[in-house]
UniProtKB/Swiss-Prot annotation:
It comes from Methylocella silvestris (strain DSM 15510 / CIP 108128 / LMG 27833 / NCIMB 13906 / BL2). Its EC number is 3.6.5.n1. One of its GO terms (biological process) is positive regulation of translation. This is Elongation factor 4. Keywords: Cell inner membrane, Cell membrane, GTP-binding, Hydrolase, Membrane, Nucleotide-binding, Protein biosynthesis. GTP binds at residues 19-24, 136-139. The keyword Cell inner membrane applies. It is found in: Cell inner membrane.
Length: 601
């Protein structure tokens, strides 16, 4: 590998909403610069996990180094950083963007600006990026490039008059994108003689190499055999391999300022390599770490239990392996009377939860039940202590509680005008507080403060269904606010079912409880005795349904004759049922749990 002057390096990322063609554009850039031989070209080269390809989303940051000979005759190194676009991975996005100096903003010329586009553009602007707008899919009959340019100027405030027009699918305009990267994005700044300072962008576990760390060198030089230190984790290692991605790994001797590449150092656990940490030289450390590092904080919690109790050990092993790769995922053991042994897991958000669950089921062949997702509540007790509550079943005695605080989010929703009424109604139902509402062309942008508790359940699905899939949604957690929350328990035959207990707002408890008991009534099969299903807050029953008993027709053998004879047989049956009900155990089928937890709030 020949060394390039720092002025000929460009580090850039691509910012886009799901399905606006980010990965396809990346494929075309890789193809155009000849980084991958034509026969090795697969769709979405950078999305390496199957789930990423199937869902069309990018989960981990990926990078590729492209070499490009520009129109001015100079050879440039272009480092493309493919970032996740989903809100759950917002912190990973901000770190990936911190590794670059510029971004391509890809907008679908037929769809226009979406909520996630906005969120990620703001991340890019916060990172001080130069942004080049790119209009994709101009080959579609529905494309309206002029209108979308105007929209970019109105909504984001970027000058879009020089936007690059492309069709990533057919390959039109890709060379213009490459020229724009070289001419309109700035080169990195860095001092080769200063002490080593590098940003840890991402890390993953490889069975042969241990942990592979994706780094962006800011100052100094990173060499093979160098002793390094991770500043936030305070871990020390010796670099044993350095290289760059062209998308396949290729070894190099060193990484200079402005370069993006990978290192391995026989690191055993991903927990030592935290995204956003600063890597420096052990002997000659840099004075201060790079700003913006935050340890990953789980936001959503839920219990994961194996359907078959015999799979518990396999589940434990599988979680350990996923944890190697994903330090933002945390778990601890828990047991539930209804579901047996399992784990209480913490996630960055709902998509993260779905992905982890899907990876456990897919990569490790496990059948899992997930309990209702819950958020972290802060409980201020009468004696002044504050505790964090991850699981509604562990709620302390209500008489000891002063206040319960719940997390709130600021949500930005972009929706076509026609569906605005339904969207506002949904936000109102979810205890939302309107902050702002304005129009962007034919679309409305509503900004709401909402309790996260109301969003984790099924808000996203409901939003998509009432807007026929057109509304887009993005959120950031803002603060904790006190709320009138109560713990709702579900009792089946007077026995509380711990897996179904949840914290709800007092105003919504009645409806939530009623829906839950009606749902369970359909799902629990009839037994030989009648089964009451109740929703309760403390000792007060707020909703009840009864599953009727199966009964034999005891009077069938009486033909005509005395009514008192029939009465006697019926009374005898009644007494038997009553006794049975005292001793009977109700079997709740697994499907009932799964369906009740998927319940539409």
């Amino acid at each position: 590998m020949t060394a390039h002057p720092i002025k000929n390096i460009r580090n850039f990322s691509i910012v886009a909403h799901i399905d606006h063609g980010k990965s396809t554009l990346a494929d075309r850039l890789i193809q155009q610069t000849g980084a991958v031989a034509a026969r090795d070209m697969v769709e979405q080269v950078l999305d390496s996990m199957d789930i990423e390809r199937e869902r069309g989303i990018t989960i981990k940051a990926q990078t590729v180094r492209l070499e490009y000979k520009a129109a001015d005759g100079e050879a440039y190194i272009l480092n493309l950083m493919d970032t996740p676009g989903h809100v759950d991975f917002a912190y990973e996005v901000s770190r990936s963007l911190a590794a670059c100096e510029g971004s391509l903003l890809v907008v679908d010329a037929s769809q226009g600006v979406e909520a996630q586009t906005l969120a990620n553009v703001y991340h890019a602007l916060d990172a001080g990026h130069e942004i080049v707008p790119v209009l994709n899919k101009i080959d579609l009959p529905a494309a309206e490039p002029e209108r979308i340019k105007q929209q970019i100027e109105d909504v984001i405030g970027l000058d879009a008059s020089h936007a690059v027009m492309i069709s990533a699918k057919t390959g039109v305009g890709i060379d213009l994108v490459l020229e724009a990267i070289v001419t309109r994005l700035p080169p990195p700044q860095g001092d080769e003689t200063a002490p080593l300072k590098a940003l840890l962008v991402d890390s993953w576990y490889d069975a042969y190499l241990g942990v592979v760390v994706l780094v962006r060198v800011i100052d100094g030089v990173l060499r093979k055999g160098q002793k390094i230190k991770m500043m936030a984790a305070d871990a020390h290692y010796e670099v044993d391999r350095i290289g760059v991605f062209r998308p396949k790994m290729q070894d190099a001797e060193q990484l200079s300022p402005g370069e993006i590449g990978f290192i391995t150092a026989q690191i055993k656990q991903v927990a030592d390599t935290r995204v956003g940490d600063t890597i420096t030289d052990e002997r000659r450390p840099c004075a201060q770490a790079l700003p913006g590092f935050k340890p990953a904080q789980p936001v959503v919690f839920c219990g994961l239990f194996p359907v078959d109790a015999a799979d518990f050990e396999d589940l434990r092993a599988a979680m350990g392996r996923l944890r190697l790769n994903d330090a933002s995922f945390s778990y601890e053991m828990e047991s539930s009377a209804a579901l047996g042994f399992g784990f209480r897991c913490g996630f960055l958000g709902l998509l993260h939860l779905e992905i982890i669950q899907e990876r456990l089921e897919r990569e490790f062949n496990l059948d899992l039940i997930a309990t209702a997702p819950s958020v972290i509540y802060k409980i201020v007790q009468r004696d002044g202590d504050t505790i964090e509550l991850h699981n509604p079943a562990d709620m302390p005695d209500p008489t000891k509680i002063e206040t319960i605080e719940e997390p709130w989010i600021r949500a930005t929703i972009l929706t076509p005008d026609d569906y605005l009424g339904a969207v506002l109604k949904l936000c109102q139902e979810r205890r939302g507080v309107q902050v702002d509402l304005n129009y962007v062309g034919k679309r409305a942008m509503a900004v709401y403060d909402l309790p996260l508790n109301e969003v984790v359940f099924d808000f996203y699905d409901r939003l998509k269904s009432i807007s026929k899939g057109y509304a887009s949604f993005d959120y950031a957690i803002t603060d904790y606010r006190p709320g009138d929350l109560v713990k709702m328990s579900i009792l089946v035959n007077a026995e509380p079912v711990d897996a179904l207990s949840m914290l709800v707002h007092r105003d919504r408890a009645d409806t939530r409880g009623r829906v839950m008991v009606e749902k369970l009534k359909e799902l629990i099969p009839p037994h030989m005795f009648q089964i009451p299903i109740q929703a309760a807050i403390g000792g007060k029953i707020i909703a009840r349904e009864t599953v009727r008993a199966l009964r034999k027709d005891v009077t069938a053998k009486c033909y005509g004759g005395d009514a008192s004879r029939k009465r006697k047989l019926l009374d005898k049956q009644k007494a038997g049922k009553k006794k049975m009900r005292q001793f009977g155990k109700v079997e709740i089928p697994q499907e009932a749990f799964i369906a009740a937890l998927k319940m539409d709030g």
